Structures are given as structure tokens and as C-alpha cells.
Amino acid sequence: MDAPGAARKRGVNGVACSHLDQIEIVDLPESIAGCEDCLATGGRWVHLRMCMSCGKIGCCDSSPNRHARRHAGSEGHAIARSAEPGEDWSWCFVDEVAFVVG
């Protein structure tokens, strides 16, 4: 049996995320204009993600520029959450595991 609270630290496939200590921001901003980098360059996006370390809004891996993944790699911020309405899952780019915080 897992210790209390262990379930929220495990991904949907049972793999634990080892970067939970990087989570600083959980809640989405009240309004999101779009992917910050796409807005600056005139790019387009499919879905949005929010870095849970610094709050930067980037586009998903289905988007042409994959700015959320690029940000994770360049800044070392491993975890992003979905910024889509009604979604509360997060993703660790390093451990490649999805999970829900809370």
C-alpha cells in the first residue's frame, strides 16, 4: 500500500515524477491570449500549456513550434500543465509522465 498522498505523485501509468519540487505555480491565469512565443512571431498553435515553474504559456507538441517543450528544454523547467478549459492534467517532459496535481 502506498503512503498517504503517494497517488497524486504517480503518473497515469504508475511511473512517479521526480520533478515535483519544481512546481511553483498551479493555477492558470484568469485570461490567456495564446502561446507567448507564437504571438510574438505570428505563429499558430493547437493547444496551450503552462509552465508550472514560471507560468510561461507555450504551445503543445501538436503545434508546429512546440514552444512548451522548447521552454522546458532551454530553461530546465520540466513540468507543464494543460491550459485548456476543463483540463487539469500536467506533464513532465523529462520523466514523460502525465499526472494530476492536488
Regions found by a protein language model. Give the residues of each.
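Extended, low-complexity, charged intrinsically disordered regions
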Residues: 1-8
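Canonical RING-type zinc finger of E3 ubiquitin-protein ligases
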Residues: 43-52
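Cys/His-rich, Zn2+-coordinating zinc-finger modules
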Residues: 13-23, 29-34, 41, 57-102
